[in-house]
Amino acid sequence: MTPSPLRLLLDTAALQHNWRTLAAMSGRAACGAAVKADGYGLGAREVATRLAEAGCRDFFVSNWREAEHLAPLGLQLSVLHGVRDEDMPAALAGFARPVLNTPEQVERWRVGGGRACDVMVDTGMNRLGLSVTDVEAGALDGLEIETLMSHLACAEEPVEMNRRQRDALAGLAGRTNARRMSLANSAGIALGPDYHFDLTRPGLALYGGVPRPDMGARLRQVVRPQAQVLQRRRVPAGDSLGYNATWRAPRDTEVAILNIGYADGYLRAFSDRGSIEWEGSTLPVIGRVSMDLIAVDASIAPGLREGDWVAIAFDLPGQSAASGLSQYELLTGLGARYDRLWS
Ligand SMILES: *Cc1c(COP(=O)(O)O)cnc(C)c1O
């Protein structure tokens, strides 16, 4: 197959380092991995295989399609969105556990004869999960539960809501048959031992995202997009460049045109905001990001030529600040056109 003119360099050692770091930060608790949304855009199978090799045992996906994709790996999978009627055949096949979220799902699982499951309890986020009141009233009595979990709404912020959510989950200890309890996502791990329970569930930080500045020094960048120069040109002073002529050359300007655009997840938010690296120089994106192309000011890189590969700046906290996109959006938006190359 023809090599793609776009590639993601994916760093196995950095991914495994990040998991080991989060596992160490999780103390006595086991450390799992959220690999939903195709492993946050990196490729769920490749990510899960490497994390399993590092010692990870608990993997979380969103739905049964995603679980089926990973089933051949033989890992312990949990499906965060629970079970619909149409999921029951897959759910009863036993290659993953549903995370039951509603009284209807609990009933469906009981009637269908399902065995071990996980359960999500809502402790204040008001997204998915049974209410604490329902659990206290016995909604889960008799159910074979592996993990009773909840999810933090604001783990990356120092707000009092974290403590309230933590206390609400802790209050259910012993109220069900659950073998384990779980609360913390990536940022929640940094909230300390009170938040670790028996199992943590990081996603973002595994992939090099930094949910809290104090975690930045300990995590390594995993994803490095690269694109190629399609054309180099000189834009005369006063000429415009790109769609809607939003950029105008203040002087004669050397420009390189690269084959990456918003169809590759490099969204228009990077117009006049993104940058690339080439042989130690940082070249700014100028003008509007197109579907398949961007332009950079190459004035300080006289040696940059048609066909050269360049690195798209993709340190997640920095590029999130530059673009206004979340680190999660930067990862999960990475499109299908990249060759994903694991080192
Ligand atoms: C996505 C998700 C996680 C992982 O969250 P990060 O912020 O990416 O670490 C953990 N638990 C649940 C329920 C999730 O949906």
Question: What label would you give each PLM region?
Answer:
Residues 2, 6-17, 29-171, 175-182, ...:
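Active-site-proximal beta-alpha core segment in soluble small-molecule metabolic enzymes
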Residues 2-19, 66, 83-85, 101-108, ...:
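Active-site anion/phosphate-binding pocket segments in diverse small-molecule metabolic enzymes
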Residues 25:
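Conserved PLP-enzyme active-site core in the AAT-like
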